[in-house]
Amino acid sequence: CPRDRRGEELTNKIRSRTTQRIFLIMLSQERTIMDDLKIVFSDVDGTLLDSRQEITPRTLRALKLLQKKEIPFVIISARSPSGIEPIVRKYGLRCSIVSYSGSLILNEERQIIYHRGMSRAEAAKILDFTAQQHFDMAWGAYSFDQWVTPDRTDPRIEREERIVKATAQQGVIADMIADEVHKLLFICAPAWTDTIEATLKAQFPQYEIVKSSNALLEIMPGGTTKGEAVKRICALRDISPKDAVAFGDNYNDVEMLELVGHGYLMSNAPELLKKHLPRHTTDRDHDGIAEALAAHGIC
């Protein structure tokens, strides 16, 4: 009945507010002087961007204060460079970017400082295998800033284009300009994602295969992780990963969050991850990045 629904809605609101207060209390308990924090890394989807695909005003103020304090900020994402640049331009950020979870790294001047991919033949072998399995999925292949997909009209590809504000090219692996494929993206029916992931890991153990949402699988060259990317950037800047802060919300962020001295999982992360990773911040719609940075005295 309407009265029951109103009661349920009120209960949910109270529960949500209580959860947020708990996270704020936990963060305040960690408050200390953090002169040893030298660099900040952040994932994009589900972390830096809120549910409207925007950076919240408070989080943006925190990022600008990082710039003012000359604390490096690094965007680290499974997205392509062209999927990250619109965010950088829109909000006037100055930062290095890590694309494809570490397969391609560019500095603040957008010079390539690291790149590694699989060959076109290797990528084609994976795709041939998935075709034989008749998995319910769409795929895209990425090389530097080229994104190829066999059917641009697939609604799953169209949705991905809208989210990342980048355009795919109709084509196949043979159409890729460079013989260096940094990532294969599989957009799966959520009910199939875990099955496809397990099957691919069993068939191709030499690659990094990781779930970045309940519908997305990312396949990169072996040894390509956000954690390894953090190590590379920290080494170039002569910074210990223990002096870094990182933010993420999904399975492809785990190694990074475990590596750094202060790794924060957003409270909108999957429940299984929240049980695995002990340090949390508020969710992407409640200034999770800004809350954690404030608690650590950075801003």
Predicted regions and their residues:
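Short, Lys/Arg-enriched N-terminal segments with co-localized hydrophobic residues
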Residues: 9-33
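Residue-level signal for inorganic ion chemistry
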Residues: 66, 77, 101, 184, ...
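Conserved acidic, metal-coordinating active-site core of Asp-based
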Residues: 129, 133-247, 251-259, 268
